[in-house]
Amino acid sequence: MRWNRMNPFGSYKKVVSARSTLKEVLKKAQDGGIVSTAFIYGLENNLLDGVIVADNAGEFKAVPKVATTPEEVLEAAGTKYTVCPNISVLKSAVREYGCEKIGVVGTPCQVRAVRKLMKYPVGFRHVPDKIALIIGIFCMENFPYYGLKLIVEEHCGVKMEDVVKMDIGKGKFWVYTRWGETKAIKLKETHPYEQIACHVCTDYTAELADISTGSVGSPDGWSTVFIRTAKGEEIFNKMVEDGYLEVKPIEEVKPGLGLVEKLALQKKEKNMKEIEHRKELGLPIPY
């Protein structure tokens, strides 16, 4: 188990750069397609019988969905830069779908919530022991849907109905249209539209997940992957052995782990200041 002296990443067993080998995933994936590939692999190999994903309800409105087939996972592939209450369908996955081995993907705060739920299952009887895999995605901040819509339509000048993809990288928020146009604004212009609770979250890399992944640190089309637990290591190794993933040592890619560390520490330091400020004012900390 490795620990950085500043502990920007939490505990992990290893970190690599990886991408899916599944053509159908790469066509829809945001970056390396790690989440979709892991869920497809789990469903195809009886390691999972249901997964909770963020589906696109139209114009990038994210809604939680219980997917039980690889086809349903593919339909939901791709990042949505808006809040999606994935945990709200955990009970449904067990009681309505009859799932016994559930895969969950979420932002760092959602991963933390799932871990708390597993330890203190108040109101979630018979759910914790059904959670088989937790995948976390890197997250600096997120947007409520109305905030995302203002960013896209007011700042980028694009109608939501014309957007085919969004991305965050190189200090900018990118919007790609069905007409082949690309619009971008500086990331700092999006800060007023962030979810308020994001300002007191100190976790960038989903430290409590079995596997954490995000684009930062890896080349275009690849993802940086933290394998954190024995459970995560087992399924990740199986995916590599069975040819579902292509892997490179993180030390051999650019920009590398240094950029991930920079952003992780930046989030911790910035938001710890906000937490202390709120404490001084006697304000509640929603985390």
Swiss-Prot record:
Listed name of the protein: Coenzyme F420 hydrogenase subunit beta
One protein family per Pfam: FrhB_FdhB_N
InterPro entries according to UniProt: Co_F420_Hydgase/DH_bsu_N (IPR007516), FRHB/FDHB/HCAR-like (IPR045220), FrhB_archaea (IPR017679), FrhB_FdhB_C (IPR007525)
Source superkingdom: Archaea
Native organism taxonomy: Archaea, Methanobacteriati, Methanobacteriota, Methanomada group, Methanococci
Cofactor(s) this protein cannot do without: Ni(2+); iron-sulfur cluster; FAD
Any one GO molecular-function label of the UniProt entry: nickel cation binding
Purpose of the protein: Reduces the physiological low-potential two-electron acceptor coenzyme F420, and the artificial one-electron acceptor methylviologen.
UniProt source species: Methanocaldococcus jannaschii (strain ATCC 43067 / DSM 2661 / JAL-1 / JCM 10045 / NBRC 100440) (Methanococcus jannaschii)
UniProt keyword terms in alphabetical order: Iron, Iron-sulfur, Metal-binding, Oxidoreductase
NCBIfam families: frhB, PRK09325.1
